[in-house]
Amino acid sequence: MIPSVYVETSVISYLTGRRNQRDLIVAAHQELTREWWDSRRQKFTLYASAVVIEEARRGNAALAQARMELIQELRLADVTPSARELANRLLLEAALPTKANADALHIAVAAVNGIDYLLTWNCSHLANAFMIPRVEKVCRVAGFEPPYICTPQELMED
């Protein structure tokens, strides 16, 4: 079976954004994201969701259009009542801060839809070594296997 990846909005933004000339870390993340997209994406079934679409529509109109075009290449995972309930549990049970509602939904949509990986550059609330164990616990207690949350760099193969 082909593994599945939920592509979170930060990855899509790094793929479609202008190359950052000022911040070397962001520039490196953009390059790693493009490398993963060009060399690895075909090894996975890729998903987004209505949450990704909502976030991708914000900001500069031309860049938003580019993000939306890229999202059209992905399958859409459903934002079900179960996903909304799990997102609320992630927020209420201190796995994520209350301001991270969209981040909780990304995790919940991936978990409820049985998606293997959640690909992100959001290291504050998602790909965060302190948050991941709490997220995993809440998902499992709710009866869902959590996605493996990682950056494009972590999902590369030699």
Report each predicted region and the residues it spans.
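Active-site neighborhoods of divalent-metal-dependent phosphate/nucleic-acid chemistry enzymes
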Residues: 73-134, 156
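Short, flexible, glycine/charge-rich loop motifs used to bind or transfer phosphoryl groups or to couple energy/partner
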Residues: 36-37, 108-109, 139
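Short, surface-exposed, polar/charged, turn-prone segments marking secondary-structure boundaries
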Residues: 2, 32-35, 73-78, 104-106, ...
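Acidic, PIN/NYN-like endoribonuclease modules and their adjacent C-terminal/linker elements
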Residues: 1-4, 18-19, 24-27, 112-158
